C-alpha cells in the first residue's frame, strides 16, 4: 500500500512540476513581490524543505520570499493572527490551530479519523472541505492552498520499556505528555489516557532532557529531525493521528495576484505538498531502524484498545457538537 501511495504521489509531483515549468513566461513585472513566511519548523524540517526547494523556485520569477524558521519571525501559534493582520504572507498551519478560531476544524484533529496520506488528500480536495475553506478565507483572511502530510504520530517517552510498558490507554495514566497548547491538542492528549502538558515546540527537547515532561508525541521524521531520540528511551507506535498541515496564504495578497500568478502559486503549493508527502512516506519506512540503532525500543500497543478509547472520548464531547452534520460520515466514505 505504501509503495502504491509513493508511486502515485511521485507521478503527481512530477506532473505538477512539468505543468508549472511550462507556464513560466517573461510577462511578469521586473519588480518582484516581497513575501514572508514564518514557521516553527527548522530549516531541515521536511515541510520547510518542500516549500523552499519546490514551491519557492516555481514562483521565483515574480516573488521573493523571506523565511523565519524556528519561530524566529513569529511565535508558534501566532502566525494565523499575523496573516490576518497583514503582517505575514504565509505559514504552515494545522487543523488544531484553526480549531481555535473555528471549532468545526477539530474534526480533522481527531484521533483515528484520517486513515493515511492518500485519504488526507481526498478529503482536502473533496467538496466537503469547501465550506471550511470559505469560512477561513472570509473570516480570517487566510487561504488554505494545499494539505501536507506530517506523518503518523506516536507516543515517545523518557522512561525505558522496563519501567513503563504501554499497551492500552490505562498505561498512560499520570504520564506527563507534552502536547501543543491548543484545546484540540490537549483534548487528544487526554483521550489517549495521558496528562497533557502545553509546551512550545522549540522547548520540547530541553523539557525531555530535564524531566519537565515524561514524553511527547510526533511522527518519526520529527523525532529524528529534532533529535528527540537523544533524550528518550521508547516509542509506542500508537499511530493515533495521521497528522497534517495546511499551506496557509494571505487572502489579501492572493487577491492582488494576477490570474496566471494565482495558478502558478497554487500549482507550486500542490507540487511542494506532493514532494513533501513522498519524502515523509519514505522516511517513515526507513527511520524505525535508525531510531532503534540509537538505543530506543519501538513496539506496537493494543491499537484496537487505543482506537476504541479515543473515539469514545470524542462521541458526545463539545468538539463533536461543533462538527457539521454528516461530515464525519463523508470523511469515512472517502477512506478504504
Question: Language-model features: where?
Answer:
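Residues in and immediately flanking transmembrane alpha helices
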Residues: 20-21, 49, 129, 189
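A general, composition-driven signal for non-globular sequence regions
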Residues: 1-2, 20, 116
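Bacterial N-terminal signal peptides that target proteins for export
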Residues: 2-14
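A gly/proline- and charged-residue-enriched helix-loop-helix capping module
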Residues: 117-135
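Bacterial N-terminal signal peptides
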Residues: 12-22
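N-terminal secretory/targeting leader peptides
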Residues: 15, 29-119, 137-138, 143-336
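Sec/Tat signal peptide C-region and signal peptidase I cleavage site
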Residues: 23-29
